[in-house]
Amino acid sequence: MVRFESTDSLMLARQLPNKTVALILAGGRGSRLKDLTATRAKPAVHFGGKFRIIDFALSNCLNSGVRRIGVITQYQSHTLVQHIQRGWSFLNEEMNEFVDLLPAQQRLSTEQWYKGTADAVCQNLDIIRRYDAEYIVILAGDHIYKMDYSRMLLDHVEKGAECTVACIPVPISEGSEFGIMEVTADYQITAFYEKPANPPPIPGDPSNALASMGIYIFNADYLFKLLEEDNNTPGSSHDFGKDIIPQLTARKVVWAHPFDLSCVTSNAELPPYWRDVGTLDAYWRANLDLASVTPELDMYDRAWPIRTHMEPLPPAKFVQDRSGSHGMTMNSLVSGGCIVSGSVVVHSVLFPRVRVNSFCTIDSSLLLPDVHVGRSCRLRRCIIDRACHIPEGMVIGENANEDSARFYRSEGGVVLVTRDMLAKLEAK
């Protein structure tokens, strides 16, 4: 491997991605998304009209100059694998660029599935060592954000850290959902608590706690030693947040990296955008954020594009029905292949190939690919899963009791509709 000795920060920031491999943890069940992940891994869930959730981590890697990527898969991986093969096969292996799929294999040495995030990396150490990288970036494949990893790499190297953890302030009321850290003035991590019942606040900011974003940078050789130690530790859950990071605080080798130092935004006045879309309510909100007049996440930034598999689809079409009613949309995202006929779509996201027939009102809803809505339907605060056919005249989102009896209704009042739910309803 070519080694660069330049001490210039700008030059170093450009060189570091070439010495780096990114590992995206994409095997999670995403059980809090309920039936939305019954047939697909959470990173493969559709998002933002035309994307999959994993496209954000993959695009961040490419835009940051990290073009050697391993995607670690396990649960319901077919859809995810298919998406990566179709949409991310353009990298040039001759230039040492790749997206490598690393499925759980139940190797002879373990004969077990991945037991935790650290074990998922550990079981692939033989492959990862062959990448011959100096730095390993470990990413969650199920978050929505834009980040320049080269800036975090530079911070990691300049501080002389063995490990660096990206962090972001979160409301103290939500702190128990994250790994929470305590840091010194220069962001050395002195304590780390995985999903604590009583998260410690940020000093001087009692309303917020400092949360891990699930983004780690390790010196490669140090990571390999840590994983081997953890693999031989009785009682370990083999998880980065629960086991690896907490023990590093005592060794004083781990630093935090504030997200606002590497967040990519086209509007400096907006706060750094990072969303964990782990619940139906959070997933619904994050999608509809993009349909607002001035969304916090700029998907139109040509300097930091989010790439995905591009299907050969015709443009969206809005037509009038035979009675002369026009198809109309307001504050919505409408993807290729959609047809809206004589209906009104308000503050919603229509994914590819959605068909909305006449006399319908679609309000604050997500219609995933290939959804067909019959005539005279009213849908409000809904997530309609892929390929659902909503019968003519159906009303969803206006009666909480009816919605709960027929479909799944979240704590925030968002109604999830799947093909299985519709089939059971039809069979009654």
Swiss-Prot record:
Pathway: Glycan biosynthesis; glycogen biosynthesis. It holds the Pfam family NTP_transferase. Keywords: ATP-binding, Carbohydrate metabolism, Glycogen biosynthesis, Glycogen metabolism, Nucleotide-binding, Nucleotidyltransferase, Transferase. The keyword Ribonucleoprotein does not apply. GO terms for biological process: glycogen biosynthetic process. It is an enzyme of class 2 (transferase). GO terms for molecular function: ATP binding; glucose-1-phosphate adenylyltransferase activity. It catalyses: alpha-D-glucose 1-phosphate + ATP + H(+) = ADP-alpha-D-glucose + diphosphate. SUPFAM superfamilies: Nucleotide-diphospho-sugar transferases, Trimeric LpxA-like enzymes. Its EC number is 2.7.7.27. Alpha-D-glucose 1-phosphate binds at Y114, G179, E194, K195, S212. The keyword Transmembrane does not apply. NCBIfam families: glgC, PRK00725.1, PRK00844.1. Homotetramer. Belongs to the bacterial/plant glucose-1-phosphate adenylyltransferase family. Involved in the biosynthesis of ADP-glucose, a building block required for the elongation reactions to produce glycogen. Catalyzes the reaction between ATP and alpha-D-glucose 1-phosphate (G1P) to produce pyrophosphate and ADP-Glc. This is Glucose-1-phosphate adenylyltransferase.
